[in-house]
Amino acid sequence: MIKTCATGGVLSESDKVDSPQLTQAELDALVDEAHALGRKTAAHAHGAEGAKRAIRAGIDSIEHGSFLDDEAFELMRKKGTYFVPTPLPCIMQRLRDAKAPANIIQKAAAADGKALDTLKRAIAKNARIAFGSDAAVCPHGTQLNQFEIFVRSGMKPLAAIRSATSVDAALLGVPDRGTLEAGKLADLVAVPGDPSRDIAVMEKLFFVMKGGAVVRNDRAGVASAGTTTGSSAAGH
């Protein structure tokens, strides 16, 4: 995976969050060369113009996309581009706690203020939404709250789960995982309930299997019947 910054960022001090960072020609060359090497490509892009340049270049995914407009979503539909939104409820408090510079807090507030509206429009337009983490911005694992955010924004619960399983596998080009099928990696999680009815249970993982090996089992030692009643499993 080759990732580029098509627009400014939230945590950088000197640029505008939505300003384009690369020309169309530069993005065309970047994507062409990456794809020639068999690499997937992703673009950090908050602003619409920078994102549209990346989409026209054939980028595989747009990350964040806080200020995407209707033209951007139409281009994504035509090009088959994935959208990886990163609605992070923790970010504003994290920045305040860290005593971040005022301009960074201002940029974060602008992006955060548009993120949910953009996500709702993306869902309404049937965008190809994949699940991302924006790793290290919020503590690892807290991103599980995105399942509930996706559903509150209009996505069906099973579609939200697929965004983190089969959709992510397709985006990243890893066909040996993402669905529960013979011959694929046994990557499983279990939750205490039915996430198709209550997506919030996705934040209550108690069992994790990676490649057929159990790496977490909070119910180890509990009778077999007790471990299965009222629980659901999902494949990664």
Predicted regions and their residues:
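Histidine/acidic residue-rich metal-binding segments in metalloenzymes
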Residues: 1-83, 110-129, 178
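Conserved residues at the C-terminal ends of beta-strands
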Residues: 5, 65, 133, 192, ...
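His/Asp/Glu-enriched, well-ordered alpha-helical/loop segment
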Residues: 36, 40, 100-103, 111-195
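Catalytic metal-binding/acid-base residues of hydrolase active sites
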Residues: 46, 88, 136
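Short, acidic/turn-prone active-site loops that include or flank metal/cofactor-
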Residues: 65-70, 87-91, 213-214
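Short, charged, surface-exposed secondary-structure boundary motifs
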Residues: 70-77, 93-96, 200, 218-220
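Active-site loop ensemble at the mouth of alpha/beta enzyme cores that anchors a bound cofactor
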Residues: 82, 86, 90-109
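C-terminal cap of metal-dependent C-N hydrolases
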Residues: 164, 182-226
